Every structure is written in structure tokens, then in C-alpha cells.
A protein has these predicted regions:
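Glycine-rich, N-terminal phosphate-binding loop of Rossmann-like dinucleotide-binding domains
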Residues: 47, 66, 193-195, 222-223, ...
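Rossmann-like adenosine-cofactor binding region
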Residues: 165-260
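N-terminal glycine-/charge-rich "phosphate-binding" loop or analogous flexible N-terminal tail
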Residues: 1-41
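Short acidic low-complexity segments
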Residues: 28-39, 50-53, 172-187
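Phosphate/diphosphate ligand-binding glycine-rich loop within oxidoreductases
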Residues: 41-115
């Protein structure tokens, strides 16, 4: 029984050896290695090539090497009848929590302006409201979003969350559905996007959304680059409708060298590292989910392909 792995070349051999050690009962092969496609039962993938998964006639399960599954669903020839499992866990949640809290605090305390003043050798003292007067909004209340919202509330921020369906999170005012979206946006000074990427959320961070935020609001996008209409953000920054942005994900990755975000004084660019999967803990989570699936046990990270999350 063969498990095939598709991942970037930098860590491919490590992943193969680590998963083989965790799953000795399986024959782990890299995507481009020789093997009999009829023997493949499991595929562990990150950004697999279009049409690649359909070539395994006996494939039983697909595992995403991360919490996001859009990189799998984008395949027009995806065998959509197969179970799809994402990879989550404490490690990924902790990393996302750290990143989001860091950048909410950075924007709340106006550190970009202080850093710019340092470059001018200017002693700039800014008075900020206390955290309990700063309204933070988290879009997307899945495992990562709910944890970040809860953590921001524990830091003292006035936190709201928005999702398609109702949630109940201690310390967080929860909004649900399109009919309460404008109300959520109107009270949000720092907006964190942690939505899954679906056809309904693609391009959601656009001029229309920015206009419904308070003037001078800030944006943090740690979901997917396709959530953001980049030109609309640049225009909103130029007009002052948006004060600053921290972006970890982009439509094109790596971000092209000539992209205006690189040099923009009000945009912080990070290279998709907010919740980068750690091979040790991530490998264990993947192996645990595969074993649960093979034993016919419930898999908590099983996703609904039609919903997209």
C-alpha cells in the first residue's frame, strides 16, 4: 500500500523520511518517484498539479498539508467523491495566535508610525486608547479564527467575530450571516481575515468592504491572497480610508519583486509564515489522521468539499 507525497522540493525528502518513520506499514513515495499508481491509497499534498490526483485509480483519501484546502479544490479534475482531510493542531493554532496578536498590538500601538519616525530621527510620542477601547473584528470563526478572537479578548480588546453561521465564544460578540455583516464592519477598527477561501469569499476584501469600515481602519490578512483585491487596498490606503495593513498572503507567491506592496510605507509584507506547518508536529498530525481514517474512526479534520471548509 503506497502513500504518495507532493510538496515543494526544499523539504520533500525530509517529509518522505519522516512520514515513513511515522507510518512504517505504508510505502511512502514522493510524487515524482517511480511507483505503481494502482497501489496508491493515500495522497498527502500541498498544491498538487491539476489533474494529478485523478491518475490514482484506487486512491482512498486526500490529505492537505495545512489547514487550507483551496489549493486542492482548485483542481478542475479533482476526484470530488474522495474524503479530504486538512491538517490542524495545537502547533498551527499557536503560531497563528502569535502572529495575529503581534500585529493587532503593533497596529493598535501605532508602531509603524513610530518606526517611520525613528528613520527620521524624530522623537514621536503617540497617545493610544487602552485595548478595551479598541474594536477588533475577526472574519472567520473556525478553529484558528475562534482561537485568535478569544486570545485578543483575553488581551483586553473589544472583540467581535463574524461567520456564516452562529457561534458562541466567551468574551467575543459574534455576528452571523450577510444581514449582520455591515453592522460587524461598522464597529471594526482592526479587521483580521481568517475566512476559508470559497467562491463566496474570493475578493471579499474589496473597495466596498473598506468603505464600510470606520475611516482609518487597519487590515490584517492571514487567510488567502485571493481574499484581497490588491488594487482596492492600495486605493484605500491612498485615500486614508485604510490606515495600514499587515499581509501574510498574496495572490501571487512569492510576491513579485516589482509589486507596490514591497515599498509601501503603510504595508507590512511577511512571506506566508503566520502559521507555517512544522514538519515534526505537522507530520504527527497527518499520520494520526491517516491512521484514524484507515481504522474507520471519526476524523475531526475531515472537511466538506462542497462547502469548501
Amino acid at each position: 500500500m503506497t502513500l504518495v507525497v507532493h510538496v515543494g522540493p526544499a523539504r520533500a525528502q525530509w517529509w518522505k523520511e519522516h512520514l515513513q518513520g511515522l507510518l512504517p506499514e505504508l510505502d511512502v513515495r514522493l510524487w515524482d518517484e517511480p511507483y505503481d499508481v494502482a497501489d496508491v491509497r493515500q495522497a498527502v499534498v500541498w498544491k498538487p498539479p491539476a489533474g494529478g490526483l485523478k491518475r490514482f485509480p484506487n486512491l482512498e483519501v486526500i490529505v492537505s498539508m495545512g489547514a487550507g484546502i483551496d489549493h486542492v479544490l482548485v483542481d478542475p479534475e479533482l476526484p470530488r467523491h474522495l474524503p479530504l482531510i486538512r491538517t490542524t493542531g495545537f502547533d498551527l493554532t499557536q503560531r497563528m495566535r502569535e502572529y495575529v496578536c503581534l500585529h493587532v498590538l503593533r497596529l493598535h500601538r501605532r508602531l509603524p508610525e513610530i518606526e517611520a519616525a525613528q528613520g527620521r530621527r524624530e522623537w514621536l510620542q503617540l497617545v493610544n486608547p487602552p485595548a478595551y477601547e479598541r474594536k477588533v473584528g475577526v472574519m472567520g470563526l473556525g478553529n484558528l479564527g475562534a482561537d485568535c478572537a478569544r486570545s485578543l479578548s483575553m488581551l483586553g480588546f473589544d472583540v467581535a467575530g463574524w461567520a456564516r453561521r452562529d457561534h458562541d465564544i466567551e468574551g467575543v460578540e459574534c455576528f452571523a450571516g450577510n444581514d449582520r455583516f455591515d453592522e460587524f464592519l461598522a464597529r471594526t477598527e482592526i479587521l483580521v481575515c481568517l475566512l476559508p477561501l470559497t467562491e463566496a469569499t474570493r475578493g471579499i476584501l474589496d473597495a466596498s468592504l473598506f468603505a464600510r469600515l470606520p475611516k482609518g481602519a487597519c487590515i490584517i490578512n492571514v487567510a488567502r491572497g485571493e481574499h484581497l483585491v490588491e488594487r482596492d487596498l492600495l486605493d484605500a490606503l491612498a485615500s486614508g480610508q485604510i490606515r495600514a495593513a499587515a499581509l501574510d498572503v498574496f495572490h501571487d507567491e512569492p510576491l513579485p519583486h516589482d509589486h507596490p506592496f514591497w515599498d509601501h510605507p503603510d504595508v507590512l509584507v511577511t512571506p506566508h509564515v503566520a502559521s507555517l506547518i512544522d514538519p515534526v508536529s505537522g507530520g504527527k498530525a497527518i499520520a494520526d489522521n491517516i491512521r484514524r481514517f484507515m481504522r474507520g474512526e471519526p476524523v475531526p479534520d475531515l472537511v466538506d468539499i462542497e462547502r469548501g471548509y
